[in-house]
Amino acid sequence: MLPHKHTKEGVLNEKLALKKLLTYMKSVYKIPQKIKGLSDERKRKSIPLFNIVMPVLIFLMLQYEGFHTIFSAPESMEKRLKNCIRGKIPRVDAVRDLLSRIDPKEIEEIHAQTIDVLKRNRVFREGTIGGYVAAGIDGVELFSSTKKSCPDCLSRKNGTGKTEYFHRSVVCMTVGKSPHVIFGQEMLKPRDGSEKDEGGLTGAKRLIRHLKKRHSPFADVIVADALYLNAPFINTLKECGLETVIRLKDERRLLFQDAESMFQRDEGRKRSFRKGKKSIEV
C-alpha cells in the first residue's frame, strides 16, 4: 500500500511511489496499454475508457474504500492523477455505467497475462516459504444485499427471515514472502431449482484445475483451513501435482488421534522428500 500521510514528506513519498508504480506497470506489465484495448460498449463515449478504468485500478491498489466519495468530486483527483491521466476525471455515474458494461473475461485475461510475466521474470525463484512457492486458498464474500440482486447471486435467509443476496468466491494467492500475488478467483454459482448453491470445495477444485491448465506450475504447496480436509479436494491437488498443508482443528477426529499417537511413538517425527532439485523435511 502506498503512503498517504497528510504531511509534506508523506505527500512527496506518495507521489514518488505512485510514479514508480505507474512506470513499472507500463514498462514491464503493459497494463495501461492493455486497458486501452478493452471493449467499450457505451453509447456515449465523451470520457475515454482509459480515463475511467485507470483511476479505478489505482484507487483499488491504494485501498480506497468508497468510489462514490472519490468520484463525486473528480476535480480534487486531477492533481493526484496527472501523472497517468490526461483529460477529464469521470464522475461516479460514468464509472458505474462503464463498469456495468465491461466484459469480466477481458479483465481476467489481463490478470492472467500479468501472472505469465511474473513467472517469466522468475519473481518466485526463491519461493515464498522455505524455497517453495506456497499458496493459500479460501473463500471470501464480496457483496451482500437484501434489495439488489442479479442472476448470478447466491441467496440465504438472514436473522430476520429476509432473503439476502450475495456473491462469494474462492481465491488462491501466495503466502509467505512478498509480493503477495493473487493467482486466480473462482465465483461460486447459484442453485438451479431445488439444488443448493455451490460450496467452497466445489469452487476450489474448479479453481485449482483452471490454474493448473493456465499457469502450470503455479505453486508447490497449497495451504488451506479445515474446511478443505476433504478427500475429493485432496485428490484434485494430487492429480495436479501439488502438495498440501491443511489445518486440523477438531482434536476428536480420528486423523488427529492417529497422528498424535504416531508422534508419541516417535514415528512421523521427521520425513524428507525431494521434488525436483528441492528437498524438504516435515
Each language-model region and where it sits:
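Gly/serine-rich nucleotide phosphate-binding loop at the start of the catalytic core
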Residues: 1-4, 14-90, 96
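Anion-binding and metal-coordination hotspots
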Residues: 45-52, 63-75, 81, 85-88, ...
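Short alpha-helical segments and helix-capping/turn motifs at coil-helix boundaries
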Residues: 54-57, 117-124, 231
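Short, conserved catalytic/metal-binding motifs centered on acidic residues
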Residues: 55-56, 70, 91, 95, ...
